């Protein structure tokens, strides 16, 4: 529809590319949602969270549909079966979002999983349900077991690699790294199983390095993802799939339970509460079980902020910064802070101090001595005498020899 010679600027929308160097301790920044928290705190503008309607989500114990044979490597797994989907090309807005972050659109199902990965930082995978016999089993691979991954390459696994398989024993995916080509979504797919899970970082890292196979999912899993996001990512993806591909969704089948950050789980009581608490709504699984997202406390004495900043940062500004970063003050305990589950790196008072000073900016803290007087030692006096003597002798024409 365009005439030859049409300027590219009239076809491609203007955009701004921002490259961010993310340190290994900040996996929360590997998503637009996490980056929004950061920008809100630095700019002082409000944070608008992604709207996820989880009020009507039905959770059920997975039972025989999902079996975790290696819970130390994969303690938490959720699956949703969506029947009657129409696999087709994604709408323009979705394709534009993926192209903007350097991804190639494939189809609406795969594109949605990639979109949620970058939006929330939750790795997801969709299986063609017709290629899955029985249910899902996560286990370690058999020695010498092979799988052809989505990149078209065949990989030989060993007994330390985690795989997602079906109940016939066939490997469907390399856990946390990449899905298998045979069970992938195609244009002929009508029913899918959506996976959202938490895999042990060290396991994913070891498999990814040994196979020389990296993906956007493994990049996040090996740095540590929040168990809090497992359910949120699934709910968000199901919502988009029903909108763009149609179909009917089953309840969310849950196997295992979220693993809280070990450092948070070991924190002492604070603000009158004992141990970690849940501030994310508990959702009924049935049979009395609940899915919760555990948070930890960090006690931050404001006098520590006064000492490190020399009084340059007010308590109110410190509280504003922490609140903008997603932390919450415990009622009636202004020095006690609830850590958001996506901030796995905040476990000590010094971590909170670092966040405040980093966002406030070191340039805003004036350099000055801690007191009006500087003590002088005998060593200083001897050095000063030697230097003065050298200057006087040099002025008289003498040369110093060593």
Region locations from a protein language model:
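Generic low-complexity, intrinsically disordered sequence content enriched
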Residues: 284-287, 326, 397
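Structured aminoacyl-transfer and RNA-binding surfaces used for tRNA recognition/handling
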Residues: 105, 399-402
């Amino acid at each position: 529809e365009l005439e030859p010679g049409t300027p590219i600027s009239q076809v491609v929308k203007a955009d701004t590319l921002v490259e961010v160097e993310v340190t290994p301790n900040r996996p929360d920044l590997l998503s637009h949602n996490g980056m929004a928290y950061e920008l809100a705190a630095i700019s002082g503008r409000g944070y608008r969270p992604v709207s996820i309607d989880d009020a009507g989500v039905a959770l059920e114990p997975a039972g025989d549909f999902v079996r975790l044979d290696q819970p130390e490597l994969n303690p938490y797994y959720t699956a949703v079966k969506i029947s009657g989907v129409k696999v087709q090309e994604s709408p323009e807005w979705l394709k534009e979002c993926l192209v903007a972050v350097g991804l190639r659109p494939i189809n609406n199902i795969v594109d949605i999983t990639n979109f949620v990965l970058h939006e929330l930082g939750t790795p997801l995978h969709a299986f063609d349900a017709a290629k899955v016999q029985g249910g899902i089993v996560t286990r370690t691979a058999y020695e010498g077991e092979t799988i052809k991954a989505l990149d078209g390459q065949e990989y030989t696994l060993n007994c330390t690699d985690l795989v997602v398989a079906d109940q016939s024993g066939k490997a469907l995916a390399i856990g946390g790294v990449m899905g298998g080509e045979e069970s992938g979504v195609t244009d002929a797919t009508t029913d899918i199983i959506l996976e959202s899970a938490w895999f042990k970082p060290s396991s994913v890292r070891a498999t990814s390095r040994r196979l020389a196979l990296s993906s956007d999912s493994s990049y996040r899993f090996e740095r540590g993802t929040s168990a809090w996001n497992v359910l949120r990512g699934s709910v968000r993806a199901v919502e988009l799939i029903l909108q763009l591909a149609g179909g009917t969704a089953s309840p969310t089948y849950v196997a295992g339970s979220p693993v809280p950050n070990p450092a948070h789980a070991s924190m002492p009581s604070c603000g009158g509460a004992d141990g970690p608490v849940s501030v994310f709504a508990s959702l009924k699984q049935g049979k009395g079980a609940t899915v919760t997202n555990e948070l930890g406390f960090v006690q931050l004495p404001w006098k520590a902020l006064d000492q490190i900043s020399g009084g340059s940062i007010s308590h109110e500004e410190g509280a504003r910064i922490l609140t903008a970063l997603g932390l919450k003050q415990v009622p009636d305990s202004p020095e006690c802070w609830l850590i958001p589950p996506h901030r796995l790196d905040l476990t000590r008072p010094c971590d909170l101090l670092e966040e405040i000073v980093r966002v406030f900016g070191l340039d805003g803290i004036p350099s000055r001595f801690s007191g009006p007087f500087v003590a002088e030692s005998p060593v200083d006096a001897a050095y000063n005498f030697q230097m003065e003597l050298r200057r006087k002798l040099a002025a008289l024409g003498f040369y110093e020899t060593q």
